[in-house]
């Protein structure tokens, strides 16, 4: 077999392949044997029908098509291996010559990972915001802790923000009741508009036994996107009484004896959380700084596929109703043109970062280990609020374990850039990134999290190893 590669543009190649007919003869023999096993002709035992009779009955062209269609994928794979081309899209195959007794010729056009010239990461200088813990930050954390131990007491006054209410709800559209929209005795914390848009505004000022009608746009069911008249009735009003922030409270909720010790500990927790937030900003800033120094050609097919996915996801929640989609966009003060422009821009940004990090991972010869995958599995499960084993099962059943490997590899690529670059805050202080991005920090955190959550059995470890390979 002979193959050659033409570079059509920085992200697309054409592979020309020629396969001598003699190389296809074993494929023909297998095709004849397989066909003969399923054909019954008078005078011949199963599997013993001569090739010439099979050709006469089914046509040589039919057999040729079958052999060629089965042969091209493996020959394409062989051509990729020989040329070291790294495809990132679906191949487009065109048969140039296909005649019995003659060499097979076909071409494959496919999008490939572009070549990117990387700078010396140690020359990157990045500035981010400093970590600052204020008294207000600590007080907010303390209020949250006090709220967890608060007591709900009934009050005889109108509803205010922060109250807990028991309510009844019903909805109508054009005077007709919306099926399955009624609710009785529903508990709701006013000011945390998680139920229905406009509900909190309607509740404030009502007393127990009073009702109010307001208009809102339904977000689910077959009526999604339609305006509905909602009636809310307040059944009861309660407020949360917070415990006093004294030494007794500190002893109740922690291992500390005094409020001063508890406040100091809360300050440490806030500081750690802010350092973690700063680490994410450092991660993004490192990639942005690198992007300013490199040129990343974009494969249009990959960008288009990501754009199509975004559009599909937006429409699927509305039953692919274009009119409803237009209404929802109009309510947000947007339009289809603006949505598509933003979606394409996001797709281009995501693909650019993905391609860059893949090249960095190759350049740094990054290998993904089991601990890295365990960490990503646990972090992703926490992000979506699901059990790690359930997430693993979902990824395995949907053949998406490789996406976990890719994600882990790209994060390690960012860590390599961060470790080499210099980071300072806007006050001029050098930032030590080793806690979150050092070589040992990655595996140490993975070991710790794995021990805490234990999401992996031996069977899971084996499959994770296979995915990494």
UniProtKB/Swiss-Prot annotation:
GO terms for biological process: 'de novo' cotranslational protein folding; cell division; chaperone-mediated protein folding; protein transport; protein unfolding. This is Trigger factor. One of its GO terms (cellular component) is cytoplasm. Residues 429-469 are annotated as: Disordered. Its main location: cytoplasm. Keywords: Cell cycle, Cell division, Chaperone, Cytoplasm, Isomerase, Rotamase. Involved in protein export. Acts as a chaperone by maintaining the newly synthesized protein in an open conformation. Functions as a peptidyl-prolyl cis-trans isomerase. It comes from Mycobacterium leprae (strain TN). The keyword Magnesium does not apply.
